[in-house]
């Protein structure tokens, strides 16, 4: 029944975005692995007004269009697909992510598929990758591919990124590596990787942790055997179908002259069950704001996680106030997802502290 409900939810989301739905390809090559591709939209599925357009484009291609544009995919794997949504990734939320999770989980639980690929916009790709890495319970690989140029652009990067994602998902070398991101010949961890540049093709990096591997001359190569990152934890959300069951966690950004009442608004008016602070430096907050934060914590007892607004670095436990939690190496957007999963799982404050301490290596 859950499989049927998940399929119906996926179809509803896809229909609301005008996307074609589901296709099972009947002609199979028994010598090749089978991969299921999940389309969500993004630049990889976008069209511009001219071949030189690299901004101001709009989503207009389906996942089937993307597959048909790369005929050589048929040499790598048998392909089926599901169009989960067809929007820019800045419009994605748990209404889309939950059916995506269930679709991937069900595909990987089946003997029919060796792995899964997600086509996705790059704006929030790291959030989806992090979410899936913590929730998909399978040794089979999930590979997320996107593009920095629309499909109509001269030298569009999407087709090769999709080809490489299918190749990675179909490779036995990828077993046990969780969710991965692939763009621009790089294979990166879904747990660590972040979009570092708004425009560059070579934008997805984990500068401190490094890449997992690379794609060269039609070969998938990894630098080291499969290993889980420090702080990785599995969260069982197999019974989750209603997005409203995910607790609200709000990110607040540090700046000079910060209004300290923003956190009060987030909790009292918006119903936040947790707060992530994108602090300056190693997660610092204003003196006045810190006083308000502590008062709010004492009144409501909600977790407050200190992360950083810088592109990289760490917020160790000692850099957060005694009542708060340091995000370790996680940026604010990933800290938010981790905190939401902790809260959904019913973790108390000590358990949440322990989870985030693990990300720091503690």
From Swiss-Prot:
Any Gene Ontology CC annotation: nuclear envelope
Induction trigger: Subject to nitrogen catabolite repression (NCR). Not found in cells grown on rich nitrogen sources like ammonia, glutamine or glutamate, but is found in cells that have been subjected to nitrogen starvation or have been grown on a poor nitrogen source such as proline.
Positions annotated to bind substrate: 89, 122-123
Subcellular location: Secreted; Periplasm
Functional pH dependence: Optimum pH is 6.8. Active from pH 5.5 to pH 7.5. Stable from pH 3.5 to pH 10.5.
Biological-process GO terms, alphabetical: asparagine catabolic process; cellular response to nitrogen starvation
GO molecular function: asparaginase activity
Domain Asparaginase/glutaminase: start-end pairs: 33-359
Subcellular location, principal: secreted
Keywords annotated in UniProt: Glycoprotein, Hydrolase, Periplasm, Secreted, Signal
Domain of life of the native organism: Eukaryota
Glycan attachment points: 29, 93, 239
E.C. number: 3.5.1.1
Catalytic activity from the UniProt record: L-asparagine + H2O = L-aspartate + NH4(+)
Active-site residues per Swiss-Prot or TrEMBL entry: 43
Annotated signal peptide: 1-25
InterPro entries tied to this protein: AsnASE_II, Asp/glu_Ase-like_sf, Asparaginase/glutaminase-like, Asparaginase/glutaminase_AS1, Asparaginase/glutaminase_AS2, Asparaginase_C, L-asparaginase_C, L-asparaginase_N
Residue ranges that the Swiss-Prot or TrEMBL entry lists as coiled coil: none
Cystine residue pairs: none
Miscellaneous information on this protein: Yeast contains 2 L-asparaginase isoenzymes: cytoplasmic L-asparaginase I, and cell wall L-asparaginase II.
Family: Belongs to the asparaginase 1 family.
Name this polypeptide is given: L-asparaginase 2-1
Organism encoding this protein: Saccharomyces cerevisiae (strain ATCC 204508 / S288c) (Baker's yeast)
